Each structure stands twice: as structure tokens, then as C-alpha cells.
Curated annotation (Swiss-Prot):
UniProt keyword list: FAD, Flavoprotein, Oxidoreductase
Cleaved signal peptide residues: none
Cross-referenced InterPro entries: BBE, FAD-bd_PCMH, FAD-bd_PCMH-like_sf, FAD-bd_PCMH_sub2, FAD-linked_Oxidoreductase, Oxid_FAD_bind_N
Name recorded for this polypeptide: Aurantioclavine synthase cnsA
UniProt pathway: Alkaloid biosynthesis
Amino acid sequence: MEGCTTRDSTGLGLGERFNQRGNVFLRLVSHVQCAIKFAKNHNLRLVIRNTGHDGSGRSSAPGSFEIHTHHLKHTHYHDDFQPVGAVTTSGPAVTVGAGVILGDLYAEGARQGYTVVGGVCPTVGFVGGFLQGGGVSGKFSHNRGLAVDNVLEIQAVTADGDLVVANDYHNQDLFWALRGGGGGTFAVVTQATVRVFPDVPCVTTQLAVSAPEGLDDHSWMQVLELLLRGLRSFNEERIAGEFHLRPDPLSAILTLHFLNTSDLDSVDRRLAALIDKFRTSEIPHIYSSKSHALEVPRSVEAKLYASHELTSVQMPVLYSLDPSYKVSYLNMGDPNDADFRNVYWGPNYERLLALKQKWDVDALFITRLGKRHDVMNTIPSTGAGADMRSFNRDIYDLLRNHAEDPRLNEVWTAINTVTEWVDWITSNGARMIPSDIAFRFWMLRVYMTHDWGCGLTSSTAEL
């Protein structure tokens, strides 16, 4: 592997110890090619790792050989991009290396007057699992689609070590699979070219409603119905928004993103109709339209129970209301959902599986929730302790990526000390990945603190 930097957890070279975890930190596409060939020739358990934010544990595995792509940092703006093989151009675009994080991409776009369809966390790698898992954007998707809807071309290294271009003119089947089929499954994506949009202003506002002590359930359901109907009305106008519930104290928060405006008065007028419904509802409540830091229960067990309850009880009830309508997001899914093939891909799974067998004959790329996921069951297990150490390492990387945010320390300590937790999850068939707990804890606590150019209204009122 000349030209690649390799080491394992003991500090010894990979040529000396194959039974230990190996890491290769890549700076060139040629490094990716030789690393893949090395893993294939030595029958190593290969894992593709970018910034380590994957909540399903797909960016790590016990005893694995990890290919790190976060050093592939390059961006190039195109005034009018022409994909390879195309006879026409596709308009303004940006080519993004696999290691470019969203915060840097947004900052570069702000300097040049454009933006991309991306998520809220600035330390997530744009081209990694985020993009390949669909790429939902809370602010932009209602107007501009998912991140994958705006991909024009992908460069990737296949399981054979070949560098290929995938777009609407070359390797169309791989291009289709890489846009939503899941990261680390079909090939190692080294860069992607995506459509860009003018960097327009945006106003983000929140309407918070809390229930006074003693409010009956029926009245609270009426409040929630008003909020949800309001959200649907705004969504129909292509205004993005999210709805959050907090159990203690009982409250609900509606967040809305008004693109292409900086006029706070116009936003207030848009909200007035919804607020008037609360004023005339005769239901006791308190509301405000200011930004709030969302709080979540700190108990690890509580988070595990909530995840299991969502997958096993709440979602099946919702699906039963209309079996023909299902919407799932791979990047935020339960890694242990037994029905993941149907939940995330439905009728597309068989086509994706066929493409997996075409582009990765020997199943070199194996991940949780991925195609040929069954092969993972044949990989020797090193025990629950190794799994815990592996997933705790994900948390360590999250701490590193977020400048060792002290708010994660409590969660990390709890996960390391609650050893019986693993057996409890296994016995109930609802195994949850520690990195997901830490990541969700961090994300919920700082959800509205990163504001990439959007203003926040701050008026308050009480009834």
C-alpha cells in the first residue's frame, strides 16, 4: 500500500497484525483505490468512515479495516456545469470532495453567493452518508427537494478499485443506487457535483405552546391539532417546518422556515391567522414565538425505551391507518428494525440488491441496514464488550468533531457505566447504538444555535 498512511490500534503496521482494527487516512483518490484493493486481497472487514456521525453504527465495526475519507477536502464552483457525456449544461453547481463538512461548504457558498440543500449540523460530511442516505434538509427540502434530487454527477471507487463516473449518461444504474441506497454499500464516493441555488435570506421562527398544570388530555389534543393543521397549511405553501413535543413540562414547538424573505413583519402577518385560532380557542395555554433550546430526558434507558417504542408500537399504528402511504428516512432510522428492507426501500429493495450483486460481487461493502446485510451474520463476533468499545469510539469522534462539547460528557459516561444495558437491549430485540444516543442528545440541545444566515423572530406573548 505504498503511498497510503496505515496503522492499527496498537500502532503496528497492517502488515504485522491483520487481526486488529486498521485505519487508513486518505488524501488522494489513488489512496482510496489501493486501500480497497488491499482490503479485498486480504479479506478484511471493510468500513467506510467519513465524519463518524452515523447513528446506526455503519461507520465502525469491531475488528474492521476503516477507510477514512474526511481528508478528501476540495470544492470547485462551476458557473454552468456540463456532466461527462452530456451535450448540454446543467447550470450552476459545485463539486464537493468526500471530506468537506457542511459548515465549510455553507461558508464557501456564502462567499460566492450560493447555497446547497444540506442539513443543520455543520460538522457532518456532505458527500458521505448524509447525501447517499437521501439528504433531508429542514429548511430547503420543501422548496428544492432532497439533497439527492440535486446531484448531477458522482465520482466513486468500486469494489474492484476502479475509479468511475456515475451520472445520467454513464453508469446510470450506479448513479441511481448511490442517490438514496445508503452510504458504504455500493462504492466509496470520493466526490459529488450538486446543483446550487442563490444564497437568499431566510427567517426561522418558532411558535411554542405549553399546557397549564391540570389541563385535560382532550383540550391538549385540540391544541396539538391546531398546531399540526397549521404546519400542514404552511407545508402546502412550500414553507418548511418541524413539530416537536416535550413531555415535562407538557409543551409543543412549531418551527417554520420562510425562505427568500428578510421582512419580519410579513412573517408575523403569516403567523397571525394561526395565533388568532389559539386566542379564540378558549383552551387554557401559554404560547410564545421565540427560539427555545429543546430539552430531552437525560436517562440512557429512557432514550432506548423511546426508540424501541417508536419502532415497535407507534410507527406500526400510524402505518396501519394507511398501509399504502409510508415515509421513512434512512439516516435517522432504527438500525435494528427487522423490516428495514420494506421500511426504507419498499419495492426498490430488489433492484438495489441486484445492483449490489453487480457492483460488489464479493460483498466487500457490508453495513447495517445495507444490501447483503445478511452477510454480517457470518462475520465472527468479538462479543458485546467489543461492540460497546467500537460504538463508544463513535461518541469519541463526535466529541472531537464538536470541539469536545461538554454537553456530551454526561451521556458518554452513562453509556460506559451502564454495562447491563447491552444485555437488556438484546433480550428485548431493540438494540440501540450508543453513538445515536449521544448524537441525538447533542443535536436536540443545539438544534437552533447554528443559524446559517437565517434570522430569528423574538416577540413573545402570553394568554
